[in-house]
Every structure is written in structure tokens, then in C-alpha cells.
Amino acid sequence: MLNTPTSARASLVVWHITDSALPTGAFSHSAGLETAVQAGEVVDAGSFLTWLRGYLRQATYGEALAVVLAHRVGSVEKLASLDELCFSTQTASEQRAAMRAMGKRMAKVARIIEPDDRLVVEYDAGLRERRYKGNPGIAAGLVLRAAGVDEHTAAAAYLMQ
């Protein structure tokens, strides 16, 4: 990762948003590992490594991409399209429910951090009014952009949580 100057506030927002203790539910979400174990797909270190590689690939092109695209969103219309796109890529009902719940919680935190950013406020309000489905990567991307964090750092930090 490149060394880039950043404000102390931006660094604090990164640390806060990506803290595993942040009460969004991400810490307790197994990302499908429990199901893979129960189905006999993960039984040893080798099969776990295979599962983990698949998870990281999905996270890179799913959640990290959601962070970057949310970081770039400039309008409510594009935000709505991104939310719908992210929801449509989640095929398992458990994943949709988990993402919706975590997205709602992350958006609430984002609004506390950046109460004057129009897209942060819009996403939180839209989730409460059920106009959006919810995705924590979108909420994180919006708040990290608003805090002045570049998109590369935002995506990398999000994957570290």
C-alpha cells in the first residue's frame, strides 16, 4: 500500500469503521463457513484453504468492490442502482438477510460519523424507509469517502475487518 498523507480524523474513521468490535454483526457472520462445514465441504486444513481462497475472491469482487463503487457514487440514482446490484449478487437467503442487517447497522454508524454528507444520510434514511436493501460495503464506502479516505485505502481497510 502506498504511503499517502491523511488527516488524523480520516485515520480514526478508518479504524472505527473497520474495528471488528463495531456492532454491525460482521464479527459473528461466518460468511458461509458454518454451512460449508455442515455440508462436509470443509473437513481439514486443505479444504479450509480452498474455502478461504473462494471467500477472499468473492470478498474482493463483492464487498471490496462495493466499497470502491460506493466511494465513487455521486448521485442518489447511482446509489440506488448500486444497492440493487449488490443485493442481486447475493444468492443465498442467509447472506441477503445478513448483508441487509449489517448494512443497516453500518449506515446508522456512518450517519453518526458524517451527519452532513447527503449520500450517507440518504442511504441511512433509505434503509430505514425500506427504499434500499442494504449492504455494509456501500455504507462503509460512503462514510470513508466523506471522511476523506481514498478508495484504495477504504477497500483494503474494509477487507481487514
Predicted stretch roles:
Residues R53, E84, L159-M160:
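Short amphipathic alpha-helical surface patches that mediate protein-protein
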Residues M1-L12:
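Charged, compositionally biased N-terminal leader segments and the immediate start
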Residues E41, A45-G46, A155-Q161:
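C-terminal auxiliary extensions adjacent to catalytic cores
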Residues L12-P23, T50-R57, S88-Q95, Y123-R130, ...:
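A short glycine/serine-rich beta->alpha loop
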Residues T18, L22-H29, L33, G62, ...:
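Long, contiguous hydrophobic alpha-helical segments, chiefly transmembrane helices and signal peptides
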Residues A10-V76:
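Glycine/small-residue-rich interface belts in oligomeric ring/scaffold proteins
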Residues V73-G148:
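Internal, conserved structured core segments that host functional sites
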Residues H152:
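Extended, highly charged
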